[in-house]
Structures are given as C-alpha cells and as structure tokens.
Amino acid sequence: MPRLYIKANDLEELDSVRIFDDRGKEVYYTKDDFIATGHRIKIYMAETITECAYVQEKYDRLGDTRFEFASKDRFGTVARDPMSRMARYLVDYDEAWEIVGDPYIWKYSVYRGAIKIIDVRSEPYLIPGQALNLTPTHIITFDSESDVLIGLTFVLAIYALNKYRY
C-alpha cells in the first residue's frame, strides 16, 4: 500500500510543501497561490517540475465555499455541509466517497462504499533521509497506486477547506 508523507510544520508555515514517499524521496511538491478567484494549490511532479494536479477554491451563488480537486482526467468537488453542525462534507466525485473521522486533526479515512481507500493520520514520524529526529508528520496511506494522485488532491482539498474557511 503506497504512502505519502508531509511534514506538518511545513504545511502550516510555508506556501510550498514537499511530499515524500516511503524511502524519503521527494515525489511531489505543492505551491499555494492566491488569485482573484480564490486559493489555488498546484501539485507538481518533483522530478519533471510539471504540474500534474490542482486544488482550486470556488464559490457558488449562495456564497458557500467549495474546493475543486483535479488530477489528469479525474476531478470532483468537496464542500462543507451547510445543514450540519458537525464537520460533515459533501463530496461530488464520480465514485461515492465518504469521510469518516475528524479531518481537523488529520485523523480520518475515506471510504468508497465499504472499502477504505485512503487513511490519513498525523503522528510523530522519522521520514528517512529528511530529519534526525521525530517530527510531526501527516501520513497518507492509499489502497491502490492508481488512487495516489487524486487521493492526494482530495486530502489537500479537505485541508484547504478547513484552513481557508472564513
């Protein structure tokens, strides 16, 4: 099962974040921009420096915020459920994804029906080749290799929805 690692301090403090694999190799990096229509997080392949995915802030007619996430030919949106007092999310994607857990503290899972496809945890971890001590790290585990990039954009969309709420 593929895993990606994001240093929690970098994500909170910097507008550019490196994303590592199990061996400590940088596989993606992100760049957060603010443009006239809202926030946009671009995801680049680390080796080729080409944009491979993005997360874009969008507004509807009622003024509610949602984030569009896209990777190659796969895309969807995620928004906070305005009818719920709890942290519930409305996911519009071609597969029925459901979030179980608490995204505010990076401890949740994403299910497609009854199958867990993404697991997100935040805990002290030593990324190989990146640190000499344990650092707060967001660990994203995917069920299959084909869901890695779209899953990463989805996780960053949830993060952006929680961070940039007004």
Task: Report each predicted region and the residues it spans.
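Intrinsically disordered, low-complexity proline/glycine-rich segments
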Residues: 1-166
